[in-house]
Every structure is written in structure tokens, then in C-alpha cells.
Amino acid sequence: MPIQVLPPQLANQIAAGEVVERPASVVKELVENSLDAGATRVDIDIERGGAKLIRIRDNGCGIKKEELALALARHATSKIASLDDLEAIISLGFRGEALASISSVSRLTLTSRTAEQAEAWQAYAEGRDMDVTVKPAAHPVGTTLEVLDLFYNTPARRKFMRTEKTEFNHIDEIIRRIALARFDVTLNLSHNGKLVRQYRAVAKDGQKERRLGAICGTPFLEQALAIEWQHGDLTLRGWVADPNHTTTALTEIQYCYVNGRMMRDRLINHAIRQACEDKLGADQQPAFVLYLEIDPHQVDVNVHPAKHEVRFHQSRLVHDFIYQGVLSVLQQQTETTLPLEEIAPAPRHVPENRIAAGRNHFAVPAEPTTAREPATPRYSGGASGGNGGRQTAGGWPHAQPGYQKQQGEVYRALLQTPTTSPAPEAVAPALDGHSQSFGRVLTIVCGDCALLEHAGTIQLLSLPVAERWLRQAQLTPGQSPVCAQPLLIPLRLKVSADEKAALQKAQSLLGELGIEFQSDAQHVTIRAVPLPLRQQNLQILIPELIGYLAQQTTFATVNIAQWIARNVQSEHPQWSMAQAISLLADVERLCPQLVKAPPGGLLQPVDLHSAMNALKHE
């Protein structure tokens, strides 16, 4: 057979073997094109797992009429124009072969309009030579791509496609990965006319964690340790699950991004695994969602047909940087215990059918006994000495010798905790007996404490503790039961025999707390909850409450109310002055006993006089 130039369609079909592996590959390429076009909303419509229809609609910048034909041609792109551009890629796509490859194995239609155009235009390629036809169309600013009958002209490829459910699961996973990469973009995924996933654009860190919980699940979010690590041009952000509490289900969560591009890189995985190896079992894997930012000139993304792998120019530096970042946050994790009465935690195991009962990850349950904060980087700047990045006195231009003995005595007196006679419960110094106010809120400290001024004294008040006491007061019935709020959609859960027996035994007490339910042979249906629980994630809170009740031998409304108050999720991860003032007003009204005799952990006096005396000594 003589050497000859292959027809365009055959050449594109050969190229499609690398680019278009399955419907999920098509979705990935097209959604990434939408993101490169600056879209803030992308709608993905799928029919029959992508075999019948894949429609991607965005609100990006659109494509000009005169460029539509080029968009469907091989090796035509707006992402790069020279070798220098290729060596510093910042876009997701750059080869200019995706649309041509997809159109060669499907019936592809491209409709687009730019903001400067008065009307939209539609293009499609057909025939052996892949001739492009362009005609007018109706369309808003942005682009819509329709891929019909994928692999209709390549029966061998179509024969290797899996079931509709399997193919859609691969598409769903691709959208999950993209949603974790771009929190600023709204993504809507529909299958056979039904909306399956809806990820709204978010900007604030708290909202990002809600999307993280929606994608990775509440168990991962509960164990996630935040990472913020930087050295030179390298930055590592994201979350890694505490290896001490990593389960088999969590090990499937391994998402890594390099400059916003989803990756499956062995070097990155090895660095993370090495950092966690002391706390992981032989058959365990770390769970993480990490974002690595690096100078584009220091990484080559053009080494894999599907762009799943990269090559770092300084691979050892990148490996050690990731290793140090993950290891540091694991070493710096801390645990603090709430000052309320200790109660045995509810069992964490939840049956699969209970998880499937309307799971809503956008409301994350509070962790009652553990608080984790982002680790402070010790590997910054160019520091590589043995002090772990800590600044020594010799590094400051005006460093002075240590304080003198007299100053030390003053400081020790300031920092010393006053000794008191033993008591069953630690009680903070009470305010005046006739006072019914905590005082005036001066400012918010560290986002969760209020600095108060009252009768010439300064107090530091824990807002989360005050909120828990308020919730407990709101949930504790007085002369009449707590008002029940009917649920628009009752929550139906499967329960064991022991759980059902515990619920029936505590039904009257739960009714006083505003929790109403009905039970049958193997299920319980929650029909009403008190007002403080309406905004909570009941799919998580109620099963944990049932587990707690199943562990108890006797029941009391005050104990149940206290357990609920400890386990509800605060609505204020960061408190403002107005929120703090409103909270204290409610506490003073509903919990006047806290003003007269504050419990331990609520108020801490600040000794300004000792501080002023310390400043006066030289």
C-alpha cells in the first residue's frame, strides 16, 4: 500500500481515540472550553449516559462568526500562538483538536454569539472532508455545544461503552472534580431531563467548605485539616483528612489540582502518602483535596493525551514542599474540649439507606469535642534552617536582651491563674448581684469571642459557649412544651429494634422538646422539630440523636436538650458586633442565671491593672 495522506475525517477519528475515550471525556473537554471562555455558569444536559445527547451551554465570551469554521478544524485554537505560550500554559485547553475529534465521531452542532454580534450563528461539520456549514441561529451571549449519537460511525468504539448508569457516573465524577477546581462557577448537571447536581458559585471560605461537604461528604469535612503553605513561587492550599480517623470510604477522596488543572500525578500522591505513612495502616490511603500553584514555566502539562499528568522541572523541590506542608498540618492539629458536661457521643456508624435518605451536605454538623484550625506555615520564604522557620531574636535589627527579674515577676503575676477552693463546677467570677447585663460589647476577638466592659472591668466572653447555653434554654420546656414546627417534607429513616425501642420510650419527652415522629415496623418518620433545629442538617442530626438515645438507660428532657445544644451547627462561623449584641440580649432574657453566676468556660476576666503595671516597669 503506497504512502498517502489520510482523509480529514479518518485522521480526526484516529485522534479521537486518544481524546474521546468515553462520554465523560467529551464532557471534560467541552466544560473546560467553557471555563477558558470565562463562563460563570455551565449547564450540562445528558441523555442515556451521554450516548444519545451531550449538551453543554455556557455564558462565556462566545465565538465570532468568522471563527466558527476554524473552531471545528484540527489544530486551531485561541489559547496559544507560539512556543513561549506553550511553555507557560495557563488555560485548560491548548491543542485545538478536541472539537475536531469529537465532531468526527458524533453529530456535533456548535451555536455561539459574542456580545458584539447582533445575532448568533450555528456551525456543524459533515461529510468525508468535514466541511463546515454556518447558518444564523437564536442564542444568548455564550456558546452551546450539542453532541448527538456519540460513536455512531465507529461501531467498535460504541460496543465498548458501558451501561447508561456507569457512563453517567463517570460524567458525574468529572463534574465533581471541576466543581472542586472552580468554586466561582455555577455548574448544573441534568440526566434524562432531571436535575441531578447543582453547584452554585461561592466566594467565601465558609461557603467553599459547604461545597466541599456536598461533593466529598460530611465525614470528610468533619476530619478535614486545612492547609495553607507557601515557599517561593510554590503555594499549597486545600484539605487533608486526619489519618487517625481515615476510613475506607474516605480513601476514595483523592483530588489534586495543579494551577487549577485536575491531576493524577504519582509524585504528588507519593509526597502525601509519605507525610501520612506513620499514621496510616498498610492498606489505607490518605484522603485529600489539594491545590498546588506553581510558576507555569516550571511545569510541563503537554505530556499526556488527556492532560492527566504533568512533569515538574524541579520535581524533588515540589515533592519535598508538598511533603513538608502536609506533615506540618498533621503535626500542628490540636484538640480542645467543650466546657459543657461530658456526654457520650452518638455512634458514628450510619446505615447506607439512612445516608441515602435525602442527604444534604450544605448543612454540616458541628463536631462537639474537636476544633481544628489551619496550620500556620513554618516553611516560608527561603528559610531552611533547623528552627523550622521561627524568627530568632538575632534576626531583628533592634533586638533587646531578655526581661529583668523584676519584670519577670510582674509578668508571672499577670499570667498566673488565681487559686480557688475546689468546687464541683468551675464558675467564673459573678457580676454584681443586682445586674442583669453582661455589659457593653467593645469588639470581637478572633472571630468567636466578645470583649465586654462592665462596671469598670473587662471580660472576655466565648460566643459559641453562650450560643450553646441559649440553644439549651430554647429547647428546654418550661410550663408548656416547646412549640413544634412541622416539616414540609417529613424525614423517613430506617431504625434498628433497639433504636425503635429507645424512641418509643422517650417519645413523650421528645414531644415536650418539639420533636414529633411516627414509627412503623422498621422506620421512623420525623414530622416536626423545634424552631432552633429548622436550619440544621436533620439527615445527620436526627440519626445521631437516635443513636444517643439508644445508648441511654434513663431519659430526662434536660439531658436530651443539652445533647442537642452541643451537637447543633452554629449559624455564625465568624461573629460580627451586631450578632454578638443580639446573642447576649437573648441570653440575658432567657438565661438570667448565667449573668449572675457565669459557668466555667463562658467568661474570663482580663486584668488590665496588672498589664498596665507591667508596662510601667522598665
UniProtKB/Swiss-Prot annotation:
Check the record and name the SMART domains matching this protein. DNA_mis_repair, MutL_C
Alphabetically sorted, this entry's keywords are: DNA damage, DNA repair
Q: Which GO terms describe its molecular function?
A: ATP binding; ATP hydrolysis activity; ATP-dependent DNA damage sensor activity; mismatched DNA binding
Q: A single Pfam family, by name? A: DNA_mis_repair
Instruction: List every stretch annotated Disordered.
Output: 367-402
Q: Does the keyword DNA damage apply?
A: yes
Q: Where is the composition biased (Gly residues)?
A: 382-392
Which is one Gene Ontology cellular component term of this protein? mismatch repair complex
| InterPro entries, per the entry | DNA_mismatch_repair_CS (IPR014762), DNA_mismatch_repair_MutL (IPR020667), DNA_mismatch_S5_2-like (IPR013507), HATPase_C_sf (IPR036890), MutL/Mlh/PMS (IPR002099), MutL/Mlh/Pms-like (IPR038973), MutL_C (IPR014790), MutL_C_dimsub (IPR042120)
* Similarity comment: Belongs to the DNA mismatch repair MutL/HexB family.
Task: Report the protein's function.
Answer: This protein is involved in the repair of mismatches in DNA. It is required for dam-dependent methyl-directed DNA mismatch repair. May act as a 'molecular matchmaker', a protein that promotes the formation of a stable complex between two or more DNA-binding proteins in an ATP-dependent manner without itself being part of a final effector complex.
The entry's protein name is DNA mismatch repair protein MutL
Report the source organism: Salmonella paratyphi A (strain AKU_12601)
> Lineage of the source organism?
Bacteria, Pseudomonadati, Pseudomonadota, Gammaproteobacteria, Enterobacterales
